[in-house]
């Protein structure tokens, strides 16, 4: 049986991690457009 605390931590970290990756990718995408050296 999964501990409620552990389950809460996992369910709390997953959206934060996905949001962090999305923001990082978005910033890198905008930075790539601003400084396009190709």
From Swiss-Prot:
GO CC list: cytochrome b6f complex; plasma membrane-derived thylakoid membrane
Provide any one GO MF term from the record: electron transporter, transferring electrons within cytochrome b6/f complex of photosystem II activity
In the bilayer, the protein is annotated as: Single-pass membrane protein
Localization in the cell: Cellular thylakoid membrane
Keywords linked to the UniProt accession: Electron transport, Membrane, Photosynthesis, Thylakoid, Transmembrane, Transmembrane helix, Transport
SUPFAM superfamilies noted in UniProt: PetG subunit of the cytochrome b6f complex
- GO BP: cytochrome complex assembly; photosynthesis
- A Pfam family annotated for this chain is PetG
For this protein, the parts annotated as crossing the membrane are 5-25
**Which HAMAP family does UniProt cross-reference here?**
Cytb6_f_PetG
Q: Which family does the record claim for this protein?
A: Belongs to the PetG family.
Q: What does this protein do?
A: Component of the cytochrome b6-f complex, which mediates electron transfer between photosystem II (PSII) and photosystem I (PSI), cyclic electron flow around PSI, and state transitions. PetG is required for either the stability or assembly of the cytochrome b6-f complex.
Q: What assembly does the database describe for this protein? A: The 4 large subunits of the cytochrome b6-f complex are cytochrome b6, subunit IV (17 kDa polypeptide, PetD), cytochrome f and the Rieske protein, while the 4 small subunits are PetG, PetL, PetM and PetN. The complex functions as a dimer.
Q: What protein is this chain from?
A: Cytochrome b6-f complex subunit 5
């Amino acid at each position: 049986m999964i501990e409620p605390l552990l389950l809460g931590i996992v369910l709390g970290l997953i959206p934060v991690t996905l949001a962090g990756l999305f923001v990082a990718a978005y910033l890198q995408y905008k930075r790539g457009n601003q400084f396009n050296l190709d």
